[in-house]
Amino acid sequence: MDLFGNKVKAGETLLSVNPFYLRPGNLSESEFLKNVETLPLRLDQPVSSAPVGRRVGNRLFVMLHNESDLEQSGVLGLTGGGLTAVSPLRFRIPPRTAQSFELPIKEVRKKESPTELMLFLNGTTFRTPIEVISNQQVGKEFKLDNARGKLEFGNGRILLEMDVKDSSDAGRTGSRPLWETDCVELFFDTDPLNLPLIHPDAYTRNTFRLFITPRDPVQLHTWGAIQASACDLQIRSNPSGYSFRLEIPAETGALLGFDVKIDDAAGNSLRETTLGSGKKLFRNRCQFSLAGERKNQ
């Protein structure tokens, strides 16, 4: 029966996130447990993809999960939603692992059909709906309407330097939320291509946020695994605003999820400026911009 006590037809049943209960019927406890231990399971699709992919220009980053006990190899493609793969991509994944792949793509005449990832595996083609999220590429130097910055990462550290134009002093934060005063919100993800099968947009242990409040006695606030005491922050005020240099101890790969939101409070108004085009950065790490360059596979 299902979670609500409704009877489920006996026979082969598709396993999903919705649980159901097995009942012993006329079997004894020992007979029932023996049958459960020997219950046959069939994995029709041993390789699955995360429900989202991250697009940067003409590249789409996807993550494939091999849920079987055998190495799997096949061909990866994309269709629908006005996108297609430039050419099929061959893949090979060890058992019980997940791996990210970079798929070259191009735009085609827009179609009404949804975007689907195609997996040709063991003689069968599987089609999986996928949400394509477009991310901005951030270089070593970047600009916002009211700021400019430099970003470096590698060798166990992230180094960020920024010059912010904000000549209106909002005073100390006091009881206000940090993002409702003069503040620089920083978003980091040291493993941005890790896309789980469930809730790939959710923050992970590799995601953290930092808040810089230049007008406060305590100027650095952290959320996540990074501690403020482990960071080195230097802030200087100037007639047009302020500048800072921030060094963060963090292991990174070739790509870094990164974004900036500058909050400028002046009286009863609040101006917000964001580096990338991502929405709801405070809860969706897949919306972060991407910095760095991944080497060819």
Q: Where are the regions that the model predicts?
A:
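Solvent-exposed, conformationally flexible loop/turn segments
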Residues: A10-E12, V52-G57, P94-S100, E131-G139
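Intrinsically disordered, low-complexity Pro/Gly/Ser/Thr-rich segments with frequent PxxP/GP/PP motifs
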Residues: D2-T13, G82-K110
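Contiguous beta-strand segments within globular domains
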Residues: R54-F61, N155-L159
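Terminal connector regions
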Residues: P24-N58, E107-S134
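Short beta-strand and strand-turn-strand segments in soluble, beta-rich domains
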Residues: M1, T79-P88, W223-D232
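Structural preference for beta-rich elements and adjacent junctions enriched in aromatics
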Residues: K110, P114-Q297
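Asparagine-centered strand-capping/turn motif at beta-strand->loop junctions
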Residues: M63-L70
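Beta-strand-rich recognition/accessory modules
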Residues: M1-S48, N238-L270, L275
